[in-house]
């Protein structure tokens, strides 16, 4: 039984019976946890207004089985003010985390990166793409996706900014004479290593790489947040 307060955010919620919710949280000490929020769908439930995305929460839960019960949830601060593109980008981040995080596995450093990501989305709406790419690289590192962007995987030589490298899953980047969807310029790889996405071409290459690297974690099922983005803002999907 867990009695202490824990910091967390709502990642996803779904109906459970006529009056309750199952809620996926991302917590600082326990990673992703799924809790039963009893009565949270009732009109007068204090949980109804509290269990919203992008609100920093203090949580308590109890129980001995796999599915534990949320006993208390309070806002730790005001909801982060997401607007339009930032809002859908935040939903995208939440959906990806809900899919890729192991249940009840702590990711304390990633939790801090998530908090920074959400804060930046709320306060820097013109920097959405660099913010998302930065978090995706941080997330891949937290998941154990060990790619060295500064070393050629075949030779061990330092990556040259002027050369082209082909990405090979489970191996890394090797020097290549080819140019296709799996190849990247050395200068871009070195920028990836530093999380430097100030160059537009590097930013586009980073998006191509993260889509490629996240695919094994996300599977073939389309992201609902991306579909929603396409239907509502078809001309601005580039932001996610």
From Swiss-Prot:
<keyword id="KW-0227">DNA damage</keyword>
<dbReference type="GO" id="GO:0043590">
    <property type="term" value="C:bacterial nucleoid"/>
</dbReference>
<comment type="similarity">
    <text>Belongs to the RecO family.</text>
</comment>
<keyword id="KW-0234">DNA repair</keyword>
<protein>
    <recommendedName>
        <fullName>DNA repair protein RecO</fullName>
    </recommendedName>
</protein>
<keyword id="KW-0233">DNA recombination</keyword>
<dbReference type="Pfam" id="PF02565">
    <property type="entry name" value="RecO_C"/>
</dbReference>
<dbReference type="InterPro" id="IPR003717">
    <property type="entry name" value="RecO"/>
</dbReference>
<dbReference type="InterPro" id="IPR037278">
    <property type="entry name" value="ARFGAP/RecO"/>
</dbReference>
<dbReference type="InterPro" id="IPR012340">
    <property type="entry name" value="NA-bd_OB-fold"/>
</dbReference>
<dbReference type="GO" id="GO:0006310">
    <property type="term" value="P:DNA recombination"/>
</dbReference>
<comment type="function">
    <text>Involved in DNA repair and RecF pathway recombination.</text>
</comment>
<dbReference type="InterPro" id="IPR022572">
    <property type="entry name" value="DNA_rep/recomb_RecO_N"/>
</dbReference>
<dbReference type="GO" id="GO:0006302">
    <property type="term" value="P:double-strand break repair"/>
</dbReference>
<dbReference type="InterPro" id="IPR042242">
    <property type="entry name" value="RecO_C"/>
</dbReference>
<dbReference type="Pfam" id="PF11967">
    <property type="entry name" value="RecO_N"/>
</dbReference>
């Amino acid at each position: 039984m867990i009695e202490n307060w824990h910091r967390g955010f709502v990642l996803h919620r779904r109906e459970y019976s006529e009056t309750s919710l199952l809620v996926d949280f991302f917590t600082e000490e326990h990673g992703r946890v799924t809790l039963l929020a009893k009565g949270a769908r009732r009109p007068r439930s204090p949980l109804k207004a509290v269990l919203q995305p992008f609100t920093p929460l203090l949580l308590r839960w109890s129980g001995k089985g796999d599915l534990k019960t949320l006993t208390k949830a309070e806002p730790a601060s005001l909801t982060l003010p997401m607007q339009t593109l930032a809002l859908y980008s935040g939903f995208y981040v939440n959906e990806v985390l809900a899919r890729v995080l192991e249940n009840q596995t702590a990711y304390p450093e990633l939790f801090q990166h998530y908090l920074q990501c959400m804060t930046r989305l709320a306060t820097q709406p013109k920097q959405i793409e660099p913010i998302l790419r930065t978090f995706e690289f941080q997330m891949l590192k937290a998941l154990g996706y060990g790619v060295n962007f500064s070393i050629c995987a075949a030779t061990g030589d330092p990556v040259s900014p002027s050369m082209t490298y082909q990405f090979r899953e489970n191996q890394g980047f090797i020097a290549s004479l080819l140019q296709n969807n799996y190849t990247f310029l050395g200068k871009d790889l070195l920028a990836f290593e530093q999380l430097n996405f100030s160059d537009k071409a590097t930013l586009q290459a980073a998006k191509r790489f993260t889509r490629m690297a996240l695919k094994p974690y996300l599977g073939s099922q389309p992201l609902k947040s991306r579909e929603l983005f396409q239907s509502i803002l078809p001309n601005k999907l580039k932001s996610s």
